[in-house]
């Protein structure tokens, strides 16, 4: 969904100070040279993007410098190398937010255009051009991106934590089931 204003109107109305916008023009091109992904995430957050701290963004992925505050990236999202998140169009300069749902994966070289929402657990193929919303639990690929199929993977398998491990192991609980390292360590501490 594109906003009804163009980029120039948005620049005048945005809630960010002009000094911060100027600093961000210097910082954003340098983020790709930061070797630590958590620091890169913090820098993107400082520039205005709404990124969950568990999201991983590759070095060469780029967020739009014009309006990074319109980008929202959910928990556990993986954004591969060369991905471009563009919040404004060049033809008529309309702006639009980009929302990427939790546990989604964006393949290398994909381009996400303004006004796109990517659902939870979605997978975007490499070099895809996403110009429409992507529903949850699907795979998309191509130019323009089209739905290939459902991911078909139970959500519990994608995001295993100590909290949901016990319920997942449930009925097939045996000595052969390997526990996550944190769960095994916690069990050792309890027995001591």
Region spans (language model):
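Right-handed parallel beta-helix/beta-solenoid
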Residues: 66-68
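Left-handed beta-helix
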Residues: 47, 53, 58-59, 64, ...
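Conserved catalytic-core motifs of eukaryotic protein kinase domains, centered on the activation segment
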Residues: 89-90, 116, 150-151
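A transmembrane-helix-recognition feature enriched in membrane-embedded lipid enzymes
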Residues: 1-53
């Amino acid at each position: 969904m594109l906003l009804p204003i163009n980029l120039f109107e948005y620049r005048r109305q945005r809630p960010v100070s002009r000094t911060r916008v100027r600093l961000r023009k210097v910082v954003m091109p340098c983020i790709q040279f930061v070797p630590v992904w958590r620091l890169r995430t913090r820098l993107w957050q400082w520039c205005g993007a709404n990124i969950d701290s568990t999201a991983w963004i590759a070095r060469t992925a780029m967020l739009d410098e014009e309006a990074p505050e319109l980008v929202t990236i959910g928990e556990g999202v993986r954004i591969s190398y060369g991905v471009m998140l563009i919040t404004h169009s060049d033809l008529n300069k309309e702006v639009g937010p980009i929302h990427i749902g939790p546990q989604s994966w964006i393949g290398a070289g994909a381009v996400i255009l303004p006004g796109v929402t990517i659902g939870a657990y979605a997978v975007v193929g490499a070099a895809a051009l996403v110009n429409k919303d992507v529903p949850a639990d699907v795979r998309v690929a191509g130019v323009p991106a089209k739905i290939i199929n459902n991911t078909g993977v139970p959500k519990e398998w994608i995001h295993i934590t100590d909290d949901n491990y016990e319920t997942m192991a449930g009925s097939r609980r045996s000595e052969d089931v390997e526990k996550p390292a944190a769960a095994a360590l916690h069990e050792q501490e309890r027995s001591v």
